[in-house]
Amino acid sequence: MSKQILILPGDGIGPEIMAEAVKVLKRIDAQHGLGFQLVYDELGGTAYDKYGSPLADETLERARGADAVLLGAVGGPQWDTIDPALRPERGLLKIRSQLGLFANLRPALLYPQLADASTLKPEVVAGLDLLILRELTGGIYFGQPRGNRTLDNGERQAYDTLPYSESEIRRIAKAGFDMARLRGKKLCSVDKANVLASSQLWRAVVEEVAKDYPDIALSHMYVDNAAMQLVRAPKQFDVIVTDNMFGDILSDQASMLTGSIGMLPSASLDANSKGMYEPCHGSAPDIAGKGIANPLATILSVAMMLRYTFARATAADAIEHAVGKVLDQGLRTADIWSEGTTKVGTVAMGDAVVAAL
């Protein structure tokens, strides 16, 4: 029986990078006889333009029925002035929560060919390979109450709420320990337990879960220190587990250790490893339509999809090796280009990866 993948190109550079990822997916499908069925729909700004909503009900049903979802990127300035509840990003938050995608995997891996692209000294980042596991469906982005009000003195005030339940923390902590077991057996839990009540519960529950993983070395770190340590000595980390907002910030920071966010894939998984896969970068409306966007993060997201949802590690390895081969050939999109390498566009980079397969 064929496996169904829902393709959501999204906004900005999304359709351009998705076209290259789909080329790679079709080639790997043909080579390995995977039998994927691809279904297309809209999410974000393009969905708002087409359906009047950033996530249409029928799109959500297609996502529920699919085995995996592959997303480009959402957002753009043309939707900045619409009702906040209908902005592209709300569609992304809704599909994550409705599909129960609570675990966001964001690797920060430095390809040796791109060591010069990092703004840090080569000796600080050489060999970097860490994974940030971000809780994705709780915390301050979803917490209620939230809103705006006018105080008695006429001053405007805005407020948000940062709640976490024991069960939400337990399941992401367990996922963190499981990932650490597959990697270097080190887990660092990042919180702000010196100030936040939610972080105090977070730390307590992580400690409880740790009792089931005696083989994993657990450490705790405050988020401000973690941000500093990521720049000072990033190779001390193997797996970092943290809440929604801290993970959002730290994973973007970690991405630049590698030289370009255009290289980094991500996976968002439910309890059964059904997932949505997308590049870590945004929709980059400033370069949309110019044919210069880096498709490698989206292509590597396909590899993550094959690995985590479909358990096809050999096919995933083939894509990752093909990306390495293309970098060995000196091909670079503008964001990772340096003197002595060959600058290519989005389509040429996608074609090169297909050829390397």
From Swiss-Prot:
GO terms for cellular component: cytosol. Binds 1 Mg(2+) or Mn(2+) ion per subunit. It catalyses: (2R,3S)-3-isopropylmalate + NAD(+) = 4-methyl-2-oxopentanoate + CO2 + NADH. InterPro entries: IsoCit/isopropylmalate_DH_CS, IsoPropMal-DH-like_dom, Isopropylmalate_DH. PANTHER family: 3-ISOPROPYLMALATE DEHYDROGENASE (PTHR42979:SF1). The keyword Ribonucleoprotein does not apply. This is 3-isopropylmalate dehydrogenase. Transmembrane segments: none annotated. It comes from Xanthomonas axonopodis pv. citri (strain 306). Belongs to the isocitrate and isopropylmalate dehydrogenases family. LeuB type 1 subfamily. Pathway: Amino-acid biosynthesis; L-leucine biosynthesis; L-leucine from 3-methyl-2-oxobutanoate: step 3/4.
